[in-house]
């Protein structure tokens, strides 16, 4: 069930679902596994907010166990493509593709709350079918792994060799460890102002 917010104005009352209301303050939520549906929704919201004001920051809150690499890359590429800075904020868990999107936010504006957890690892694969198809899928997984590792190295400033080593298995971090690693820039507990768009 999605809560509804009632707003009053001179023209009367208007009801919003909570996510639509937050979108007015340029806040987007990724609170599920990353799949094509949620990626399309987030991409559409980012493009809409860019058209509304290309100079104002967008705030992407992330609480996600990860999911589809292809869907995640659609979100990531849009984050890099649009004009507004995208501030990423980890609440709860940012794992796998969730952690990758967290790191892909605008440098200096990647944030985690104090009790969040961040996890990086290599892409998961489960190839089945004829041997030739398995070979094709194996090559694709290696390509994805190398691409993600290279981008993580770019966003964190870590050497590629360390990224490859550290993503070989599930690698959980506290916010402080993620900051030291370069996945985020700040650990905060309170926003500086009591407004929805105060995180910066």
Swiss-Prot record:
Keywords: Cytoplasm, Hydrolase, Protease, Serine protease
One Gene Ontology molecular-function label: ATP-dependent peptidase activity
Entry keyword Hydrolase: yes
One Pfam family cited in the UniProt record for this chain: CLP_protease
Domain of life per record: Bacteria
Keyword hit for Cytoplasm: yes
Similarity annotation: Belongs to the peptidase S14 family.
Name this polypeptide is given: ATP-dependent Clp protease proteolytic subunit 2
Lineage: Bacteria, Bacillati, Cyanobacteriota, Cyanophyceae, Synechococcales
